[in-house]
Amino acid sequence: MLMPKRVKYRREHRGKMRGRAKGGTEVHFGEFGLQALEASWITNRQIEAARIAMTRYMKRGGKVWIKIFPSKPYTAKPLEVRMGSGKGAPEGWVAVVKPGKIMFEISGVSEEVAREALRLASHKLPIKCKFVKREEVGGDSNESN
């Protein structure tokens, strides 16, 4: 499971999930990616389930990059506890994902295999996602004059 090695504070505010992702909106490492279309918290267990679904479908071929990291702790109070008396104990870790963020990247496999692997991974996540390809930078062929 992904989680920080150590943190300065054990508890954080929930925060707002307004706007679109600032960075990480393009495919950089791989050839294909899975892009978020909604804002949500993605838990470390959901990230791991999506990773396993992708790697099993690809038969351990190709390479997978996980572009999100669960660095935000979420807390929960025990069942049947009255209100008040402080914030609950840390329960797990989440990654804050906003629309436009590339969550996973794949390379080393065909487009059909990558599309199906990322589709299987998207079923493990609580948000709508879409398959994206790497945008090739134009102008390389004309500069060889």
Swiss-Prot record:
Pfam families: Ribosomal_L16 (PF00252). It comes from the Bacteria. Keywords: Ribonucleoprotein, Ribosomal protein, RNA-binding, rRNA-binding, tRNA-binding. SUPFAM superfamilies: Ribosomal protein L16p/L10e. One of its GO terms (biological process) is translation. The keyword Iron does not apply. One of its GO terms (molecular function) is structural constituent of ribosome. Gene3D superfamilies: Ribosomal protein L10e/L16. One of its GO terms (cellular component) is cytosolic large ribosomal subunit. PANTHER family: 50S/60S RIBOSOMAL PROTEIN L16, LARGE RIBOSOMAL SUBUNIT PROTEIN UL16M. Belongs to the universal ribosomal protein uL16 family. Part of the 50S ribosomal subunit. Binds 23S rRNA and is also seen to make contacts with the A and possibly P site tRNAs. This is Large ribosomal subunit protein uL16. It comes from Shouchella clausii (strain KSM-K16) (Alkalihalobacillus clausii).
